[in-house]
């Protein structure tokens, strides 16, 4: 162990071994470089385990008090930078135990009674991820709130809607942003749902078969905030479903972030120009002084590959493992740690982008929705209201659009006389129906982009976020 109060020494193996590990294999085998991330959880689990051993009469109360005191001292040493595990510790569990024995002597050797590193690491990892879920929930809520704030600002703003990245129908911009609010809500629900399966304690399952030591697994589960225990000891130490399930849920978060990121990149392009990037969230070019680059959404879009890759890696790692514990499981931690870190960073970055990094160019948006044929469907709807069968109306409007393209005019620029040459049912009120605002307002079906419907949804979301005094 290098330079810390924990000292050095060989691994904690039995006398079955006559030789030490080859130095290269020792480096290859060790996980202390990354699983030290689990230190706080390892200490919490060990404290609960020590108290349970005393409650069950396995060790003396005084010994449990000594163990708890020693574990808290390790926590303090870690906070002050004095606790510095090294390669010889192999992992966080041995590092803590070695220091505890150095502090307490023979009493420190009693801590591992009735447990194995197999159930210990499973406990640590679940405790760690549970805490990260709480933090991710706040990131998701913050991102939702940033989307909602923008939606409240633009409840009366229009934006072109697209299918196949071709202009389709005009939308209320708030409606577009609320679509992402809904996506994030599903993300939050998925995280909450997986927590139910995550929050079971494997502690006390020991290596794989349980233990003859008279322990109380439910006591430690309760002390650590778990909802219950694994019913099968073999399953308890073999299960890494929660790492896959979380990474899959995080991958969907990244999908949603990436879809918005792609739209922001498109909206910020000179060809589109729907948003203006601020200096707070954009970068320049080392060669071209006129450039303002959308690095934040581009990085978010790119970082999806990391999260997706970790998900695939976890699936591949687990798929061929026989029960119970296998060293392959060591590979779950760096993947899981990076999924959490990357997803959290991307949520934070996109939240800041929405809050400080962009503004919508409403004049450009208004001009865009007025300069295309995205109101063509409304001509068909108009004719349907005049008792023209929809498919007939659809074919007719296609012919009208073709004519307009050939003549270089918009639908609203045709004269009433020319319209009536296409169909006699058309009257002067068609022109009012074709204005972009009326096109949007007409979408009054529940969940539609009509202003009244959008305001209903804004009111619901504002109430959820305590913003019920918003005026649209």
Curated annotation (Swiss-Prot):
EC class: lyase
Signal peptide as annotated in the record: none
Biological process according to GO: arginine biosynthetic process via ornithine; L-arginine biosynthetic process
Keywords, in A-Z order: Amino-acid biosynthesis, Arginine biosynthesis, Cytoplasm, Lyase
Membrane-spanning intervals of the chain: none
Cellular localization per UniProt: Cytoplasm
One Gene Ontology molecular-function label: argininosuccinate lyase activity
Pathway: Amino-acid biosynthesis; L-arginine biosynthesis; L-arginine from L-ornithine and carbamoyl phosphate: step 3/3
Entry EC number(s): 4.3.2.1
GO cellular component: cytosol
Reactions this protein catalyses: 2-(N(omega)-L-arginino)succinate = fumarate + L-arginine
Family of the protein in this entry: Belongs to the lyase 1 family. Argininosuccinate lyase subfamily.
Protein name: Argininosuccinate lyase
Species annotation: Synechococcus sp. (strain CC9311)
Record lineage: Bacteria, Bacillati, Cyanobacteriota, Cyanophyceae, Synechococcales
């Amino acid at each position: 162990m290098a330079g810390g109060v924990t000292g050095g020494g060989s691994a904690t193996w039995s006398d079955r071994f006559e030789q030490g590990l080859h130095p290269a294999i020792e480096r290859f085998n060790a996980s202390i470089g990354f699983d030290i991330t689990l230190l706080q959880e390892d200490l919490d689990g060990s404290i609960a385990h020590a108290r349970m051993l005393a409650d069950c009469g396995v060790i003396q109360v005084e010994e449990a008090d000594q163990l708890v005191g020693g574990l808290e001292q390790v926590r303090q040493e870690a906070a002050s930078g004095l606790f510095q595990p090294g390669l010889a510790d192999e992992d966080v569990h041995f590092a803590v135990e070695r220091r505890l024995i150095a502090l307490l002597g023979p009493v420190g050797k009693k801590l591992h009674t009735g447990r194995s590193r197999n159930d210990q690491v499973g406990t640590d990892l679940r405790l760690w991820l549970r805490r990260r879920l709480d933090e991710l929930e706040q990131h998701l809520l913050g991102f939702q709130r940033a989307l909602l704030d923008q939606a409240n600002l633009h409840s009366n703003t229009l934006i072109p809607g697209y299918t196949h990245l071709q202009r389709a129908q005009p939308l209320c911009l708030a409606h577009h942003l609320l679509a992402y609010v809904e996506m994030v809500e599903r993300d939050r629900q998925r995280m909450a749902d997986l927590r139910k399966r995550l929050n079971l304690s494997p502690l006390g399952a020991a290596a794989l078969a349980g233990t003859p030591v008279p322990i109380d697994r439910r006591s430690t589960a309760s002390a650590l905030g778990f909802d219950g225990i694994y019913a099968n000891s073999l399953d308890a130490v073999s299960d890494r479903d929660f790492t896959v399930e979380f990474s899959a849920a995080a991958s969907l978060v990244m999908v949603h972030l990436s879809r918005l990121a792609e739209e922001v990149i498109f909206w910020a392009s000179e060809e589109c120009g729907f948003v203006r990037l601020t200096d707070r969230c954009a970068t320049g070019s080392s060669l071209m002084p006129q450039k303002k680059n959308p690095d934040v959404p581009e990085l978010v879009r790119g970082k999806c590959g990391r999260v997706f890759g970790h998900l695939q890696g976890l699936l591949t790692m687990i798929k061929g493992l026989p029960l119970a514990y296998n060293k392959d499981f060591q590979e779950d931690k760096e993947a899981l740690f990076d999924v959490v870190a990357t997803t959290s960073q991307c949520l934070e970055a996109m939240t800041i982008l929405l809050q400080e990094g962009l503004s919508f160019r409403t004049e450009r948006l208004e001009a865009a929705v007025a300069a295309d044929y995205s109101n063509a469907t409304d001509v068909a709807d108009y004719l349907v209201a005049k008792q023209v069968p929809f498919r007939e109306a659809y074919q007719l409007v296609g012919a009208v659009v073709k004519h307009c393209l050939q003549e270089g005019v918009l639908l609203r620029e045709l004269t009433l006389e020319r319209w009536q040459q296409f169909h006699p049912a058309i009257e002067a009120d068609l022109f009012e129906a074709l204005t972009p605002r009326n096109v949007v307002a007409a979408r009054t079906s529940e969940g539609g982009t009509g202003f009244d419907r959008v305001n209903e949804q804004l009111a619901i979301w504002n109430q959820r976020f305590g913003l019920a005094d918003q005026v649209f």
